[in-house]
Every structure is written in C-alpha cells, then in structure tokens.
Amino acid sequence: MSVKAYFELVRIHNVIGSAISVFMGYVVASEWKIVPIKLILAMIVVSVIAAGGYIINDVFDIEIDKINKPNRPLPSGRIKISRARSLSIVLFLVGIVLSVLLNIYAFIIALLTVLALYYYAKDLKKQGLVGNLIVALTSALSAFYGGLAFFEGSWVIRTLIPTLYIFFFTLTREFVKGIEDVKGDMTNGVKTLAVRVGIEKTWFISKIILVILIVTSFIPYFFGFNIIYLIGILFLDIILILVVLLRHDIESASKARAYMKVYALGTLILFALGTLPI
C-alpha cells in the first residue's frame, strides 16, 4: 500500500483542479472579498466528494480499465477493491457533513452530487450522453459551489458565466475521452458518442462546440473582466486550435484531452485573475 497509489486512485491532479474551480467561483462571486473559513470549507467539501467520486468510478469501472488502463491502482491490484469502496463512502460522508456548515443549499447540492456520482459510476456511465452530461454538470458545479459558499449580492449572475463555460468544455472533453477509450467501451457495452456515431462524427461535434466556446470566450471581457483575462484567453485559444482542432484520430485524442485539461486549468486561473481590481 503506497500513498502514490492512493493519489493516483483519487486522481489528485483532478481533485486539485476541483479545488481551484471552487476558489475561482468564490473570488468571481465575491470580487475577491474573501471570508477564509467559507472558502476553505467549500474547497474541502468539493475536494473530498470529487475524490470519492473518482474512487467509486474506478470500482465500477474495473473491467473496462483492465483493457483501457491496466496499470491503474485497482486493475493492477495495488489497492483492494473493498478498501477503495470503503474509502469512497467515507469521503462522501465527510463532504456531506461538512457542507451543512455552509448553508442548506450547499448541503442539498453536495448530497445530490454524491448521488449523481454514485449512479453515474454504477449505471449511467454506460448510457453515453447521459453520463457525459452528469460529468459536465458535476464539474461545473465546483465553480458554482464557490459562489454558493459566498452567497451574497449578485453571486449567481457573476458565477454563471464560468459555470456554463466549464459545463460545455467538460462535455466536449468527455466526448474526446470517448474517442480515446472507444475500444474498451465497445467491448463493455458503454454507449458513448464515439461508439454510437463513430470517431469522425464525434470529433466533428466536439470541434463545433470548441469553436463556439472559443468565439464566446471573449464575452467575459465585455462584462467587466480585466485585460489579464483577455490576453490570457487569447493565448490559450490559439494553442487549443493548434493542438485540438487540427487533430482527428484516436492517437490524437489522448494528446488533445491532455491539453484540454491544461486549458481548463488555465481558464480557471484566468477567470479568477480576470476579476482582480486593476
């Protein structure tokens, strides 16, 4: 049993990304008027629930991962399934209990998110588009949760733009992931978009959404975001076009999805910096 295996199991880089998303949502909603206890608590709630979600997903996904990702902690035997299942339950419970300390709405969203993550891993993932929508929604809720933790003034309006952006970007990334995993998904009956309509059409749909996101990525600047956001998003968009939009095969999917993670993290940072009073 190694700490590294558990970090890999919970996808620690994704968990950190979720925490950053909460931070971004909070500072965008509050315009950097930070109440540390609220922010830290919200980041912990989202992080532990996200970690629990990644674990339970691997528990239910072990047969697919034996084909697609045999070196993951569970299919490789580095961590026992029973231990992973127990850890996911503990993390879910910790997140739900801590959410009560924020407000009733934070508790409700935390509870619904846990249920969504569990049933996504258990059944809904195999439904393809429905599963993709759940992943996109729960990812976007990380940013929304940051605004919810602030819960003052026009927090909903201020948090809505990054929340919607994260939703559609994550949805596209899930489509690309389906291209990467198409072989194992076909074997295990997972009805992803790539399995249903083919790789070429899935790439086309993904690129259409990305083009729309690129075109609309400048809108926040006209709603008060600063010049840091404008310059940064222009740079990220150019790289996105070169790395993702010009690719179209399975081999490219892995590289494209890897950059999309970097792009998503960069966008979160830019949303936060874009609300700095300069």
Swiss-Prot record:
<dbReference type="GO" id="GO:0046474">
    <property type="term" value="P:glycerophospholipid biosynthetic process"/>
</dbReference>
<keyword id="KW-0594">Phospholipid biosynthesis</keyword>
<protein>
    <recommendedName>
        <fullName>Digeranylgeranylglyceryl phosphate synthase</fullName>
        <ecNumber>2.5.1.42</ecNumber>
    </recommendedName>
</protein>
<keyword id="KW-1133">Transmembrane helix</keyword>
<dbReference type="InterPro" id="IPR044878">
    <property type="entry name" value="UbiA_sf"/>
</dbReference>
<keyword id="KW-1003">Cell membrane</keyword>
<feature type="transmembrane region" description="Helical">
    <location>
        <begin position="203"/>
        <end position="223"/>
    </location>
</feature>
<dbReference type="InterPro" id="IPR000537">
    <property type="entry name" value="UbiA_prenyltransferase"/>
</dbReference>
<feature type="transmembrane region" description="Helical">
    <location>
        <begin position="36"/>
        <end position="56"/>
    </location>
</feature>
<keyword id="KW-1208">Phospholipid metabolism</keyword>
<feature type="transmembrane region" description="Helical">
    <location>
        <begin position="133"/>
        <end position="153"/>
    </location>
</feature>
<dbReference type="InterPro" id="IPR023547">
    <property type="entry name" value="DGGGP_synth"/>
</dbReference>
<feature type="transmembrane region" description="Helical">
    <location>
        <begin position="225"/>
        <end position="245"/>
    </location>
</feature>
<dbReference type="GO" id="GO:0000287">
    <property type="term" value="F:magnesium ion binding"/>
</dbReference>
<dbReference type="GO" id="GO:0005886">
    <property type="term" value="C:plasma membrane"/>
</dbReference>
<keyword id="KW-0443">Lipid metabolism</keyword>
<dbReference type="GO" id="GO:0047295">
    <property type="term" value="F:geranylgeranylglycerol-phosphate geranylgeranyltransferase activity"/>
</dbReference>
<keyword id="KW-0472">Membrane</keyword>
<comment type="function">
    <text>Prenyltransferase that catalyzes the transfer of the geranylgeranyl moiety of geranylgeranyl diphosphate (GGPP) to the C2 hydroxyl of (S)-3-O-geranylgeranylglyceryl phosphate (GGGP). This reaction is the second ether-bond-formation step in the biosynthesis of archaeal membrane lipids.</text>
</comment>
<keyword id="KW-0812">Transmembrane</keyword>
<dbReference type="Pfam" id="PF01040">
    <property type="entry name" value="UbiA"/>
</dbReference>
<comment type="pathway">
    <text>Membrane lipid metabolism; glycerophospholipid metabolism.</text>
</comment>
<keyword id="KW-0808">Transferase</keyword>
<feature type="transmembrane region" description="Helical">
    <location>
        <begin position="15"/>
        <end position="35"/>
    </location>
</feature>
<feature type="transmembrane region" description="Helical">
    <location>
        <begin position="159"/>
        <end position="179"/>
    </location>
</feature>
<keyword id="KW-0444">Lipid biosynthesis</keyword>
<dbReference type="InterPro" id="IPR050475">
    <property type="entry name" value="Prenyltransferase_related"/>
</dbReference>
<comment type="similarity">
    <text>Belongs to the UbiA prenyltransferase family. DGGGP synthase subfamily.</text>
</comment>
<feature type="transmembrane region" description="Helical">
    <location>
        <begin position="89"/>
        <end position="109"/>
    </location>
</feature>
<feature type="transmembrane region" description="Helical">
    <location>
        <begin position="258"/>
        <end position="278"/>
    </location>
</feature>
<keyword id="KW-0460">Magnesium</keyword>
